[in-house]
Amino acid sequence: MCCLFGLMDCRGYFGAKKKAHILSLLASECEERGTDATGIAYCTNGHLNIYKRPAAAHELRFRIPGDSRVIMGHTRMATQGNAVRNRNNHPFTGNAAGGKFALAHNGILYNDRLLRCTNGLPRTKIETDSYIAVQLIEQKKVLDFSSLKYMAEQVEGTFAFTVLDEHENLWNL
């Protein structure tokens, strides 16, 4: 399975270097749950940024802007979808009213193909079970408690999700 990690600096106490150092430590500790890929999502100047690579966390150098207050991360052990294809790595990007969002998942979803068929969702080049969560939220056209609840009630399997939007709202399911 994978691992989720993150950092919230609501008061802006940490500088960019300190945030990068803390994230590097957190991500490296998460490697025991996955070394196939590592990714983070954060906001700066009202824009959502995603940095992900098919590499173990200790191989990456995180550069976080000083104004980023909320950062979510993911280390991956690939179960579906080749990690070398970066599109299969987390966090994923989605779109809803109000802007973009990032989603990362830990666990295994068993009904992703069934949900894609029954909900008329398009097939994508992303080869993971996790991406169905993005599609279900996008189907509702808004990122809020109701769409997250809908998504969580539809998927079957084991899961923990983190979702970050462009306004630095963070949801943990």
Residues of each region from the PLM?
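Conserved short alpha-helical segments that host acidic/polar catalytic motifs at enzyme active sites
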Residues: M1-L173
